[in-house]
């Protein structure tokens, strides 16, 4: 279920402060965050945000199409290595 419009989008305050500082300085370095639950706001467009996936920080370049989605959607947490082939099926 989506969040109520009355409440507005959720974003962690520490992440919002980092984004405001990066936007003021026009800093090209990625903004590191562990907050996968924060929503992408229009102020983030054009910034690179390094989202933690449980093991490392994945750089995500924010575009206009991503506004309204959560940061965690763009940094996968699981690696898919494919299904193991059965020896009998190869014959």
UniProtKB/Swiss-Prot annotation:
Keywords from the named record: Ribonucleoprotein, Ribosomal protein, RNA-binding, rRNA-binding
Gene3D superfamilies: 30s Ribosomal Protein S19, Chain A
GO cellular component, one term: cytoplasm
Signal peptide: none
rRNA-binding recorded as keyword: yes
GO term, biological process aspect, one: ribosomal small subunit assembly
Keyword Iron: no
GO molecular function, one term: structural constituent of ribosome
Family annotation (NCBIfam families): rpsS_bact (TIGR01050)
Family affiliation: Belongs to the universal ribosomal protein uS19 family.
HAMAP family, alphabetized: Ribosomal_uS19
Function of the protein: Protein S19 forms a complex with S13 that binds strongly to the 16S ribosomal RNA.
Protein name stated in the entry: Small ribosomal subunit protein uS19
């Amino acid at each position: 279920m989506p969040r109520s419009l009355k409440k507005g989008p959720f974003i962690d305050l520490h992440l919002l402060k980092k984004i405001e500082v990066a936007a003021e300085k026009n800093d090209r370095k990625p903004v590191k965050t562990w907050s996968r639950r924060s929503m992408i706001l229009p102020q983030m467009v054009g910034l690179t945000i390094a989202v933690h996936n449980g093991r490392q920080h994945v750089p995500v370049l924010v575009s206009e199409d991503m506004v309204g989605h959560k940061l965690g959607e763009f940094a996968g947490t699981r690696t898919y290595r494919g299904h193991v082939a059965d020896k009998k099926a190869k014959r």
